[in-house]
Each structure stands twice: as C-alpha cells, then as structure tokens.
Amino acid sequence: MSSANIVPSNMGITKFLLLTISTSSVVAGVFALKPFFHINFGLHLLSHYQYWRILLWQFIYWNSTEVFQALFIIYQARDVERLLGSHRFASFCVYMFILGMFVTPIFSFLYSLLFKNLDYIQPGPTFLIFAILYQYYYIVPSTVFVRLFNIKFTDKFQMVIPMIGLAFSHFPSTFINAFLGWTMGMFYHLSLLPGTSWRLPIRFVKPALSPTHVFIRPPYSDMQNASTFNPETLFALPTGLDAERTENENQVENPVSNADANDSPTRQNARATAIASSSNTAASFRNRQQISHPPLGRTSSSSVLPTGPASQLYDMLSGRSERPELGNIREEDINTVQTIMQTSRAQAIQALSQTNDVQRAVELLLEQTADY
C-alpha cells in the first residue's frame, strides 16, 4: 500500500504510521526477528529478566492479517489528524504508545494471575490503534446514513469488521490490549489522565510534515531567454547539402528564369500564362481590399508561427534563419492566396513561409495541384 498516493500531503503522521507498521512487520518477518517481540511472563520476565521486551513489543505484528486490519483502520481514521492537527495528533500517538508500553503488561500480568489462561502478550500496536479509534468515533462526524430493517447504519460501520478481527485475533491477549486502548483513549479525551496537555517538541514533527518536491523534467519554459537554446548544435546539416540549398534558393528567387530548360514550349507558355493571370488577380484583389478595408500593418511571425526555442528550430529547418525576410508574413497576403487558390489558411501560410511572395506562393500551390 503506497501511502504517498492515498493519503493527502497534509497528513504526515498518518503516513508515518502506515509506513512504520507495514515496514517493521515485513522486516521482522524477512529476518526472522518475530520471536524477539512478544512477552512471556514466566519465561522472559521472571526467568531471564528480558525487560527490554517491554520497549519493543508494540513495534510489529506477527501475521499479515493483523497488519492489513491495522492499516485499514488507520487509513479510515485519517481525519483524526486533520481535526486535531498534526502536532497534537503526533503528541497523542507518542503519549498513547508510551502509556500502552507499561499499562498492558501490568494488566495482562494481573489477569494471568487471576484466570491462568494468558501465557504471553501478543505483539503489535493494538493499544494505540484503538485509542485512535475512540477519537475517530467521537470527534469525526458521520456523513452517510442508511436504514436497513429499522436499523440505522453510518459510514463508520465499515470499521466494525476489522475492529472485531483485530481485537479477537489472539484472545484474550489482543482483546485486553484493545479494551485498554479504547479506555485510555476515552480518558485522554476527557482529560482524566495526567499530562494530556503535553506536546511533542515541534522539531521532531517537522521532518514528517516537510513536503517532498519531485521534478519530472527540468524547470524550463518558452518564457525564459531563448538565447540559451541553439538548435544548430542538435541538428547539424551535412556539408554536401550547402550547394543544393543555394541552388534551391536561387530557384525560389528567380522561378521563371530557372525553369527547366527541357520543358516543352507549350508547358512554358502555360506556366507564364498562369503566373500572369495570378498576378492580375492578386492586384485586383488588393485594390478591392484597400477600398473596402484600411491597410493592415505587418504582423509579426509570432501570430502564425511558433515562438521561443521552437521558433529557432523552425527557422533552421525551413531556411528562414538564412532569409529573415521570410518571417514577416502579411495577413492580406494570406487572404490573397486563400482567395486565388481556394485553399486552407495553413496551406497558404506554408506556401508564403517558403517565399513570402504571393506570385511564387500561387505558383508553388499550382505545382502541388499539378503533381496530384
């Protein structure tokens, strides 16, 4: 069970309890340390004087069923920490842990003298868990009420089964431990125990409450200085492409003079006719735009093209870094190409970004249409 995801970040003590109970029980089972945590009165205390077991018996559970029930109860009672506050809740847990360390062995020893059916104390923080349970039932309000066969149930009814399972897992040892924990939790709430106003020093609570910062990527954004990003170091063009790129630029600047010499006269005449008609159409459209609408100023490339490091990468790949004039695309040029070719805005921008000339953009779109 990952407490980092299921418990809110402001409930650090609940997280600590979940991790401590589960981890200590698993470690004790893996390294075969379970025999060092229970208390046998006649063998450990009276014969071998192993009084150090009184300090350790609450740290682990013997089996996974008790671990699961304890974790379920602590998780469902997590609102106790939110209502009491993490500092007070941590002080309450330490107070009850120390109190249960001595109260349960004393009462269990007296019970064994009277009834002769209690040989050892079952290990586990059952005393602390039932003390927390009393606070949960008393201070946390119910939110769901269900009536079944004239019996009213609340959302706290889900705690009954793990409570019974944990209290009767090793009767009578666990039952005595649970009963004493519930009773001492009630006495603490009613301020019938000495030292209920004691608080744990805050320096011991801060480590459990300090937030954990996790970065899944470096904190970089486009709003920072774009000069720190150099796309040419990421994409180095082969040296053999320089001559080909220069030749392509010359063809873009002089589309008619650099036409293929092997074209037939009919194809060259058709090309010239298309260019002339597109120029006339563009000129007439500009005249209508100037009459009906005021002239539009040049818009920066940031309105239609990427910005920041992405813009630098786009400039290098598209050749705009070699020809800065391609970065200024006018809105009326986009509308002109769209009207002439009846194409989408993205296609018009793509054609203009290669030449920034309406005539050449129309020619490029015509060539693309002829290829299809």
Curated annotation (Swiss-Prot):
Its main location: Golgi. Its EC number is 2.3.2.27. Residues 246-314 are annotated as: Disordered. GO terms for biological process: protein ubiquitination; SREBP signaling pathway. It catalyses: S-ubiquitinyl-[E2 ubiquitin-conjugating enzyme]-L-cysteine + [acceptor protein]-L-lysine = [E2 ubiquitin-conjugating enzyme]-L-cysteine + N(6)-ubiquitinyl-[acceptor protein]-L-lysine. Pathway: Protein modification; protein ubiquitination. It is found in: Golgi apparatus membrane. The chain crosses the membrane at residues 26-46, 54-74, 95-115, 126-146, 160-180. It is a multi-pass membrane protein. Component of the DSC E3 ubiquitin ligase complex composed of dsc1, dsc2, dsc3 and dsc4. Component of the DSC E3 ubiquitin ligase complex which is required for the sre1 transcriptional activator proteolytic cleavage to release the soluble transcription factor from the membrane in low oxygen or sterol conditions. The complex also plays an important role in the multivesicular body (MVB) pathway and functions in a post-endoplasmic reticulum pathway for protein degradation. This is DSC E3 ubiquitin ligase complex subunit 2. It comes from Schizosaccharomyces pombe (strain 972 / ATCC 24843). The lineage of its organism: Eukaryota, Fungi, Dikarya, Ascomycota, Taphrinomycotina.
